[in-house]
């Protein structure tokens, strides 16, 4: 995955596409034209959707679409949700399901090697496990998840997503 606005990213997308590899946008601030160009080049997936991707924003007095809205508007682009209930709240999970549907949505744990390690000691001073998630030690940002896929399915069901659809998105 790559930020499509970075130098060489679109060439990378075209290369992946030529090899039959699914390319993904991530950690990007691309707006609609950038996402459209990225999709056409071969980035057909949005990894860790909503994470390090802005929604609509203002520049001076004008509003602009963000990466999130641009991905929603790109028919055929699939999304990946970290549905641990921490990275994304249930309202966002419902919105993504409603707009992209089961066919264009998949679940990802984003789990570090500390999956299911709540309450256990870890050997990396750069991160802590707290509140059911990995955080940077200074608590300035999330560093990953400790959720397992079954937890993601349960989180989706708690968000009123049908069990069959939650399982399909997880597989």
Model-derived features: where do they sit?
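His/Asp/Glu-enriched, well-ordered alpha-helical/loop segment
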Residues: 63-81, 97-109, 114-171
């Amino acid at each position: 995955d790559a930020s499509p606005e970075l130098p060489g990213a679109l060439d990378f997308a075209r290369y992946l596409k030529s090899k039959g590899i699914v390319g993904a946008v991530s950690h990007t601030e691309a707006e609609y034209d950038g996402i459209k160009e990225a999709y056409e080049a071969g980035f057909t997936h949005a990894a860790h959707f909503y994470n390090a991707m802005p929604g609509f924003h203002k520049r001076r007095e004008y509003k602009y679409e963000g990466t999130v809205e641009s991905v929603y508007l790109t028919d055929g682009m699939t999304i990946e949700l970290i549905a641990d209930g921490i990275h994304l709240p249930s309202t966002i999970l419902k919105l993504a399901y409603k707009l992209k549907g089961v066919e264009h949505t998949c679940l990802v744990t984003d789990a570090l090697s500390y999956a299911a390690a709540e309450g256990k000691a870890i050997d990396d001073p750069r991160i802590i496990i707290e509140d059911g998630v990995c955080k940077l030690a200074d608590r300035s940002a999330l560093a990953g998840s400790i959720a397992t896929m079954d937890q993601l399915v349960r989180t989706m069901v708690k968000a009123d997503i049908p069990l069959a659809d939650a399982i399909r998105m997880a597989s």
